[in-house]
């Protein structure tokens, strides 16, 4: 099983977020499997094995989000044009219209 990183640009408002947590200094956002269909519609082919969910790491290209680990995500919500994540010791604000890199672990068959 090979793992490949695929980078693409998306608007956070279009993501169906199921949960948000952290791993090291990465912000991990669990998405609905519909993301697979959107990627394939945009021309990506690669034999996804999502097991119904897909783990995605978001990093903002213009804002350095440096999380302390471990971090306890309390809640998240959209406020105006921002995704606001309330955590145990800090508030993470991601502008929705900023360019976001999505790192997707895909299983090629």
Briefly describe each language-model feature range.
Residues 1-109:
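Surface-exposed, interaction-prone regions used to assemble/regulate multi-protein complexes
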